[in-house]
Amino acid sequence: MTAKIFIDGEHGTTGLQIRTRLAGRRDIELLSIPETERRNAAMREDLLNNADISILCLPDDASKEAVSMVAGNNNVRIIDTSTAYRVHQDWAYGFAEMDRDQGEKVRSARFVANPGCYPTGAIGLIRPLRASGILPDGYPVSVNAVSGYTGGGKQMIAQMEDQSRDDAISANNFLYGLTLKHKHVPEMTIHGQLDRAPLFAPSVGRFPQGMIVQVPLFAADLAEGTTIETIHAALTAHYAGQDIVSVVPLAESKGISRIDAEELAGKDTMKLFVFGTPGGEHINLVALLDNLGKGASGAAVQNMELMLSA
């Protein structure tokens, strides 16, 4: 049977990416709303309730409104790409590789919260170390990251690409979230299984798609006996058998002198690296992904596939 999919917010950055990925598929029927009618609540509600899966690509408040529109309809399932439900206990977190059984949780869920781009990289690095006992309680985790400017949506895309605008951004790279209260911090804390919120310093570069997330660590403050090798082994074991998330071999990492944030642009995979000083005192964990791929639209399609396979 052909599954009916509705993308609420299909004309935004994430929605367009999802629609592009699904275009031409014969196993699904894409329900669509004209851009001129995107604020037509009655039309949206009808489409939301007639879909097998509705994918919400909306701001937080609009996502909550959409969820309320299907409250009495158990036949429709929801994937939400906003931050509204990412730490909600009744929603499955849509990072399928996060744990061995996470894919099954997504498969059987009615409500799935798509992960944020930065948290996907951060949690991908941190959670295996918490699960293995390498990263102790109370460790002051810091997360540094750079994203392609498409992560800021249509407004930032226009600001970066059209220098004639009054609000144009001329910087090639800029920090933001300077109050250290970024909306992704709760998500990193909860799903990273941290007992202390991380210090998160995000930035944006003048490139459309791509992302580097770094988690630097002091080996002396980790579990006794921790080395670059034991961290790499923990990550490798955690993601064994996974196709989308891969851990780069240490021998290969030792030959790398730089990492290109755009390497995985246009792809839905994520690479994890472990680097460090020769003596192993300082360790740097790195996640490489596309902010619109595994960090957004690619993950949404992956979650949709899991839900359709139930």
Swiss-Prot record:
User: Which species is this record about?
Assistant: Agrobacterium fabrum (strain C58 / ATCC 33970) (Agrobacterium tumefaciens (strain C58))
The answer on whether this UniProt entry bears the keyword rRNA-binding reads: no
Quote the function comment for this protein: Catalyzes the NADPH-dependent reduction of N-acetyl-5-glutamyl phosphate to yield N-acetyl-L-glutamate 5-semialdehyde.
Write out the pathway annotation from the protein's UniProt entry.
Amino-acid biosynthesis; L-arginine biosynthesis; N(2)-acetyl-L-ornithine from L-glutamate: step 3/4
Name of the featured protein: N-acetyl-gamma-glutamyl-phosphate reductase
Protein localization: Cytoplasm
Which UniProt keywords are listed? Amino-acid biosynthesis, Arginine biosynthesis, Cytoplasm, NADP, Oxidoreductase
Instruction: Give the EC number(s) under which this enzyme is classified.
Output: 1.2.1.38
Give GO terms for biological process: L-arginine biosynthetic process
The keyword Cytoplasm is annotated on this UniProt entry: yes
What positions does UniProt annotate as the active site of this protein?
C117
